[in-house]
Amino acid sequence: ASSLVGSEMCIRDRFEATDARGAFPCFDEPQFKIEWQVTMSVPVGDVALTNTPPEETTAKGGFETTRFMRTKPMPSYLIALAVGPFDFVPVEDTSTPCRIVTPKDKAWMAKDAAENTPPILAALEDYFGRPYPYRKLDLIAVPEFNPGAMENVGLITYRETILLLDPETATVAQKRTLSAVNAHEIAHQWYGNLVTMEWWDDLWLNESFASWMGDKITQQVFPEFGMDITTVRGNEGAKNSDTSAAVHAIRAPVMSNAVFESMDATITYSKGQAVLEMFENFVGEELFREGVRNYINQNEWGSAVAADLLENLSESSGVDFHTAMGTFLDQPGVPDVSVTPLGDGKVELAQSRFQFLDQDLQQEMPWQVPVVLKYSDGSQVREHRVMLTEPSEVIELPGGADPEWIHPNSNETGYYRWDVGPEKLLEMVAVAQETFTPRERVAMVEQVSAQMRAGRITGGDYLEATTVLLNDEHPEVVNTALGNLGEVRMAFVTAELMPAFRAWVRQSVGPLVERYGLTPQEGEDESVSLVRPSLIAWMGNWGADPEVRAFASEVTEAYLADRQSVDGSIAGPCLRIAAIEGDWRLYNTFKKEYEAASVPAERQRFLSALGRFQDWSMQEAALDFTLSGELRPQ
């Protein structure tokens, strides 16, 4: 992938999986890890960067030639080259030299990245029990960069929109994304770089682990961002993708670059992450970490396959990971665990492959499901762990008495759907807020939707349950319910039903707007600022609420006059709502502001709003602009 800004800057990276051979001769496969030495000649005044620090620089004929230090053993796809008039922001308190690298005159937007990198790096070094393995760590913001980021050894590339934030207007959502992506990419320096998968069928050894570790470290270092809630939402998204008839397994044969490019990221990243979290929770954090450390230490600077990791985890935990985790790695699909109380403390657990109505998906083999039941015996809430290895098993809960209730997936750390029957499910929804954790309630939103799509509850039951969950006290439960309703709206709400749907939105979402307010309040919880944009969008767009639309117009005028006068979290939804009833004057203003904006988030806001004008001639103009070649990728 190349990135060009005028004639000033060039980035050549993202060689994964087979593009390095187009840049230089090499054995372009991940198993070939060698030491590389890069030499670059660039015009005087430009700066050359690669994976290692410079070793020697000479000047001749208007060019500077820099020979860089030899790398540690690494595969070809992790090489990166950058040339340009960069600005540098030093990052303090790190174990290795570290900088944020920006395009010229954009260093002022690197403050958040420079501040959150040291604690992330320190937490990762602590987890692995060993220091960062390379000579330097440069984090570079790349304009016109298609991937979110790329974990090149010592020179990690990021989209500008992720790495560069306006310190005065950056939102909680932006800061959370920066932290999570940063933790993911730095985690790759161990997972994927220090130890590399031998072939692309084990890409999960890179991406599943970096996703799991990135979210884990973000939650540890920045608990205010509620990354554990974001994680469970990602897990639920993976379950939805994993219910497709055409889905592949986490480990799948990769015979060509076309197959590699077509792999479903929600499986390789999110499902793999969820499976790792499930097994870590089942065997315990310390035993799991011991296995991970042994895997890294035994395979450092080399390549590995899944069996290497599974053997280390088996040895540290005493659990047969080859068999148990193998049932999740090597077949597609989501286990569906049904829980049926039999009396006298006995419970029947049964497993099958979860599927939606009218699907006929086959299960290749029984899963070995690490089930963690959560139940109340009347005096206290208990957990009971069981490895479900058969199609059905009868277990006995400690104590021998029938529980008041059973949650089949304690804290939703397991990668499986569950079924307690429609009546019990609706009873659980009714008492969810006072009984279950925020993670469990967020997942319950998705559980209710999945049960409807499987034909186990009616559409009326779904709306009744969703209305209850919409009134949850935790903003992230509300946000999840709104997102889920968006999918239902697209599937079921026709033009004829739209007036009734708008009335339902105003009735159901309106009280939430009153609860949280349209404008941010000083000292409010971060989760409130995450849900407010969704509430504004729903009321202004699908609710067509006149008060919210008037508010959005006022905010838009204020934002156009002074960016600092409007909280960044509400600017985007207000611009989009204002566009719904906007005229050509507003359309041209948004287009002009988009073209002039230097802050990545501002460009995104105006560009998104350009697509929301309802007049057909404006929609046609927006489409023409998109296809004209004038539109930058970011």
Labelled PLM ranges:
Residues 1-6, 11:
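Single conserved hydrophobic/aromatic residue that forms the stacking wall/gate
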Residues 68, 94-360, 480, 487, ...:
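Hydrophobic alpha-helical and helix-loop surface patches within well-folded domains
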Residues 38, 369-374:
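Short polybasic amphipathic segments
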Residues 42-44, 353-355, 373-377:
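Beta-strand elements of well-folded, non-transmembrane domains
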Residues 235-237, 243, 348-350, 359-361, ...:
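Long, ordered, helix-rich scaffold segments
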Residues 32, 361-369:
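Short coil-to-beta strand junction motifs in C2/discoidin
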Residues 7-8, 50-61, 377-391:
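Solvent-exposed beta-strand/loop surfaces of large extracellular or lumenal domains
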Residues 12-20, 25-183, 211-215, 248, ...:
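Hydrophobic helix-coil surface modules that form long, contiguous segments used
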